[in-house]
Amino acid sequence: MRITAITAAGLRGATPEGGWQEELRQDDVVHTLVAVHTDEGLVGVGSVFTTEDLVRGALDVLRPLLLGANALEPERTSERLHRTTFWMGRGGSITHAISGVDTALWDLLGQATGQPVGRLLGGRYRDRVRPYASLLMDQPDALRDHLTALRAEGWTAFKIGWGPFGRVDERLDERIVAAARDAVGPDAMLMVDAGGSDSAWSQGYKWALRTARMLDAYGVAWFEEPLPPDAIEDYTHLRRRSPVPISGGEVLTRRQAFQPWIEGGALDIVQPDVTKVGGTSELRRIAWSAHDHGVKLVPHGWNTAVGLATDLQLASALPDTDLVEYVTGSPYIDDLTTDRWTLDADGMLPIPDGPGLGITLDRERLARYCDVDVLLGSAS
């Protein structure tokens, strides 16, 4: 089976807010879907966390290396792409685009063999996983109402992030966390994401340590990105002294960037994003390195349905990954596939067991947000 085309289409029209200093608009493209087409009619899909123009520019570089190549060798092919483009540097648009291509190739391999990607990655440790509802922080009363509604829908784990946290004063920070814990109850998992990768983030180590102690009083399961993303020494000191686990890593790409964080003990929980880290192949390598060093991996996933499906397959194949991020209220997750995502009675999400990623894109729904004919070809 040979690769005949690689296409891309950005999602627009329902882009959710990101909590960033320069806030997103609904027509901004931050998620781009990639499709790899083959001479046997199979099409694999992947998701990339960047703009359509950057993905298409990167594919112009990568396409000559892909056309005519074996479509059933994802890891070898992706590593060849990384090595051939080494002179452009690690990370950036090339790595982001390779992320989508790599996952699309895994999807193809699964379709061709009739197996879910998780089994091809080494075997399924679980057939369902706990998703945590991920949402932006708000003023305490509004946040309480939002979380109460999600709790009523069956969610049992929650992450609140960004918003005014760490950006106004510490009294408001505690009021926000107290309102969240009150809403979700004493037994639910509650995580806090400070959003330290924000370009305007100004807090440092001493704030992070004080805040970690406050979060411990509310039973917070982890404290995410409390520091700027390059402050590895401060992260290492914080992890040693914090009473709550420290997580981060969503802005890093390629396994080499994660190595000093994992080996140096800077994080309790590492959070690569499969849609920009280098793809499924790269995230799996990072996961096993983390496992060998006693670091848990929970993938970052401000995501699409394709990205979520990828995270689910990875969660099935990694022994320590028992949580996945689920961005609540995003049509790019809830409205792209023929089968809707549904929590079971325990608040768990079943991991698709069909071939490949185990999902089918709904052309009619997808057409609301991108040029589906460009991505998947004209419907026959």
Where are these regions (language model features)?
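Motif-centric detector for short Cys/His coordination patterns
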Residues: 1-33, 51-55, 63, 67-71, ...
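Flexible C-terminal active-site loop/helix
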Residues: 1-15, 25-26, 31, 39, ...
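Conserved, mostly hydrophobic/aromatic
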Residues: 3, 41, 62, 101, ...
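Metal- or metallocofactor-binding catalytic centers and their adjacent structured scaffolds
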Residues: 37-112
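Short catalytic-loop micro-motif centered on adjacent basic/acidic residues
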Residues: 46, 133, 159-160, 191, ...
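Shared catalytic-loop signature of beta/alpha-barrel
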Residues: 57, 219, 230-247, 252-348
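Glycine-rich, aromatic-flanked loop segments that form ligand/cofactor-binding clefts
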Residues: 93, 102-142
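Metal-dependent enolase-superfamily TIM-barrel catalytic cores that perform enediolate-based chemistry
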Residues: 128-237, 241-242
